[in-house]
Design a protein with these regions (language model features):
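Noncatalytic, beta-rich nucleic-acid-contacting surfaces in large DNA/RNA-processing enzymes
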Residues: 1-6, 11, 15, 50-565
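Active-site or pore-adjacent capping/gating segments
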Residues: 1-51
């Protein structure tokens, strides 16, 4: 009835003229209320460590034990890197955070719930690797901790974890039992009024004919994050009706004012808040349509209030891998450990190069199959690059990458210092981490500061980029940056390298994320090559509710001479 808003004192007086004492009492209560909202302090629960330990001591013990298990021999460089990461984590106040994540991942593995090898920038952390949070060696794949946690930029850590699609909820239930239902809640998201939708909504309120409004809405190009203003520039027909029809002009102007505003609420697919006290002590809560308790604040506001979001994601491919592994053991007696298969198996890599990658994670689209046929991957590093390059923008560099791979003599480095950084990607800047390494190795930046430069480039912050160009080329003694010229790189060459970085950085991909997903891609390719029947059975079971996909995979089985019962 249009009453969902906070009324002014005058409105309340008009509505309740007979209850002046009640109105006065609300004022007295308001005067007695006092609240202080604390920003910048994390509100994570303290992790329960064994008797005789502090959280810091326990984290150290777990990490150094994991270091011994992961590496032989343990070098001084490894110890230094681990100590550096641990110190950064302690200084930023996230010791308990890592223990909490370690604990629920351990629970999942102890209960035969498959966990992904990693996701996002967390795969660049040696601490995460030694704890078993991730399964990807950051040293071997040249992944950077500062891409995940930057000591020069205070930001929340963000460890997103993939679990078996069918059993993800079991892990969330474990966390609820451990920390309490009141301290573990899911997060609200707001669906916004997008270009087409807002025109339809406004048209309905203006009581315009549905067919007419639908025609107008369909004039907006189907492009990600399209706005009405951009559509007016892109579509002359849309602009013409806007300028010539007074009623449509009013419709579109009204829609433009409402565009981007929240339209409805839903629950974040994976985000969960874990807090030290009842979450209602910090933020307002509400009940979702399925009865779940959710925050009324989005994750951005929650982070500002010091509440850490953790993402528990369900990945269908992990369910496929786990079910295939169980079938292999059931049918053949072979107990596969997918973390310790050969990740440089020539037969598996060659199978990807044939383009027969139906059912292989991230590599089964028609375009990706063609790319793999051209690329002919010879290592996991090639698969990582393939996943990173096959996106709008970086696709423009695919011919250059393939040419460099097939004809190394065509690769030209602007200076010798670039070769060790760009050699794995045949002279192309493919990863965000490479931008950071170039800035560090050529101009003497710290890795923390180099991440700030990488962020400025990816967000096209012109003023910051120009300031950093001066620092990159000429140095900045006051800020401790030597610069390229001081390191023997000519001014013209340094400027060219900086220009190239700006071009590539717009599209460069997070290598840590690509590497983790390349591992999942390789695992599915391995199972498909060596255990095709079990893999295809698990794959088809995972899409049993999608008749089109089932039919597609039946055709794949026939091509592989696998009998369908």
């Amino acid at each position: 009835g249009g009453q969902y808003y906070v009324k002014s004192p005058e409105e309340m007086e008009r509505l309740f003229p007979y209850a002046t004492e009640a109105l006065e009492n609300t004022h007295k209560i308001a005067q007695r209320c006092h609240v202080e909202i604390e920003f910048g302090v994390t509100k994570l629960p303290k992790f329960g460590v064994p008797e005789g330990y502090t959280s810091w001591e326990y984290l150290n013990e777990l990490c150094f034990k994991g270091l011994e298990e992961r590496y032989q021999p343990v070098t001084e460089e490894l110890k230094e890197r681990l100590n550096y990461e641990l110190t950064t984590i302690r200084n930023m106040g996230y010791v308990d955070y890592f223990l909490i994540v370690w604990d629920f991942i351990k629970y999942a593995r102890d209960h035969d719930i498959m966990v992904g090898p990693g996701r996002g920038s967390a795969a660049g952390s040696l601490v995460a690797y030694t704890l078993g949070i991730t399964q990807l060696d950051p040293i071997r794949y040249d992944l950077l901790f500062e891409r995940f946690l930057n000591p020069e930029r205070v930001s929340m850590p963000d460890i997103d974890v993939d679990f078996c699609f069918e059993r993800r909820q079991e892990v969330i239930d474990y966390v609820r039992r451990k920390y309490g239902d009141d301290c573990v809640v899911q997060i609200v998201t707001f669906g916004t009024l997008a270009a087409r939708g807002v025109i339809r909504d406004v048209g309905r309120v203006m009581d315009l004919p549905y067919a007419q409004v639908d025609t107008i809405a369909k004039m907006i190009p189907q492009e990600l994050n399209i706005t009405i203003d951009k559509a007016l520039q892109m579509n002359p027909e849309f602009k013409k009706v806007y300028e010539e029809d007074k009623e449509i002009h009013e419709l579109i102007d009204t829609a433009k004012r409402l565009e981007g505003l929240p339209r409805h609420t839903s629950m974040h697919a994976a985000g969960v808040v874990i807090s030290q006290k009842d979450v209602s002590e910090y933020v307002p809560l509400s009940r979702a349509s399925d009865g779940s308790i959710v925050t009324q604040f989005t994750m951005t506001t929650l982070e500002e209030l010091g509440l850490l979001k953790m993402d528990f994601l369900g990945l269908r491919t992990l369910t496929v891998i786990q079910n295939a592994v169980h079938l292999v053991e059931q049918d053949t007696g072979v107990k596969l450990d997918m973390q310790h298969i050969d990740y440089n198996d020539k037969k598996v890599l060659d199978s990807l190069g044939t383009g027969h990658s139906d059912g292989v994670f991230q590599l089964e689209s028609a375009g990706m199959k063609n790319f793999m046929k051209e690329l002919k991957p010879q290592s996991l590093e090639d698969v990582i690059a393939g996943i990173s390059l096959y996106r709008p923008g970086p696709m423009d560099f695919i011919p250059q990458y393939i040419r460099g791979k097939n004809r190394p003599d065509t690769i030209k480095y602007d200076c010798p210092q670039l070769e060790p950084i760009l050699k794995p990607t045949y002279g192309c800047i493919v990863y965000q981490e490479q931008v950071m390494q170039i800035v560090r190795n050529l101009a003497g930046y710290t890795l923390g500061r180099s991440d700030l430069v990488r962020r400025a480039m990816s967000k096209k912050k012109a003023a910051v980029m120009e300031k950093e160009r001066q620092n990159f080329v000429y140095g900045n003694e006051a800020e401790g940056v030597p610069g390229c010229i001081a390191n023997g790189i000519p001014e013209q060459t340094a400027n060219k390298i900086y220009d190239d970085m700006i071009d590539f950085a717009k599209y460069a991909f997070n290598k840590s994320h690509a590497a983790a997903y390349a591992v999942v891609s390789y695992q599915t390719a391995f199972l498909k090559y060596y255990y095709p029947v079990e893999f295809m059975a698990a794959l088809m079971t995972s899409v049993i509710e999608m008749p089109i996909k089932v039919a597609e995979y039946i055709q794949v089985c026939r091509k592989m001479n696998i009998k369908i019962l």
